[in-house]
Regions:
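Specificity-determining recognition surfaces
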Residues: 70, 105-137
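Low-complexity, Lys/Gly-biased intrinsically disordered segments
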Residues: 1-34, 47-51, 210-220
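Hydrophobic alpha-helical scaffolding
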Residues: 49, 92, 105, 125, ...
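Amphipathic alpha-helical coiled-coil segments
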Residues: 155, 159-162, 166-169, 173
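Non-catalytic DNA-recognition/assembly elements of restriction-modification systems
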Residues: 1-8, 134, 138, 142, ...
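A short beta-sheet element
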Residues: 25-26, 41-107, 126
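Proline-centric
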Residues: 88-100, 113, 130-150, 156, ...
Length: 220
């Protein structure tokens, strides 16, 4: 066994009180980390009631059993949370397993497909506790887990840089297109012949009733 505990969430719904402790529901469980922007919050009293069986702590893992099933995240420093519905608290045995490594392992297609293949529900996929507790994983030595985690983080950081570069490039492309259109509309995209008739004179010839405005672009 590589866990100290695997604890189901309370099967009740807690009302969002707008302030207090984060209530981790399945939408707040990302791929590796908690997504706490806009999270529902509860009072100290509700927090204590929902954590009566186990208080989530740093390096614990929270698993989403539904909507969407399969996401898993590690609790970080300063994340004092309680569980919403359809979530599971997993506490790895830290002398045997790195919490981040276990999180990555549970996010692999193999692990996700294995657990979801045992899920129930015709419309909404629901992973049962009975499928989570006996789940087997190959376990490398702790030092190897640390090395794997470091390598994964290195590659993920590189991917983030590429994604940011892609976003920056899209912004530049959009700005450039807007600038080209602006220059074209203002007659500045191609060299202008100083002997060309001013646009305002052309408009007067086309429509004798034309009344010029103060827009300087009609003067060119």
């Amino acid at each position: 066994d590589i866990t100290v505990l695997i604890e189901d969430c309370p099967h009740t719904t807690a009302k969002d009180e707008g302030k207090g402790y984060p209530l981790v529901r399945t939408p707040n469980i990302g791929e590796g980390q908690l997504l706490l922007d806009g999270v529902h919050r509860v009072s100290k009293e509700v927090y204590d009631k929902r954590n009566v069986r186990a208080v989530p702590q740093v390096d614990d893992i929270i698993y989403a059993r539904e909507a969407p099933a399969g996401n898993v995240a590690v609790i970080r420093e300063n994340e004092q949370v309680c569980l919403g519905q359809r979530t599971v608290l997993i506490r790895p045995m830290n002398t045997l397993i790195d919490s981040v490594w276990l999180t990555y392992a549970m996010l692999t297609p193999y692990s996700r497909n294995h657990l979801i293949s045992k899920a129930t529900g015709s419309t909404v996929t629901h992973v049962n506790m009975a499928s989570i507790r006996p789940f087997d994983l190959p376990l490398p030595p702790l030092s190897e887990q640390h090395r794997i985690v470091a390598e994964i983080k290195r590659w993920f950081a590189l991917i983030d840089q590429i994604e940011q570069g892609k976003a920056d490039l899209q912004t530049i492309i959009k700005q450039t297109k807007s600038k080209i259109l602006d220059l074209a509309i203002h007659g500045k995209l191609v060299p202008q012949d100083p002997n060309d008739e001013p646009a305002i004179e052309l408009l007067k010839r086309i429509n004798p009733d034309f009344t010029p405005c103060d827009n300087e672009h009609y003067q060119n």
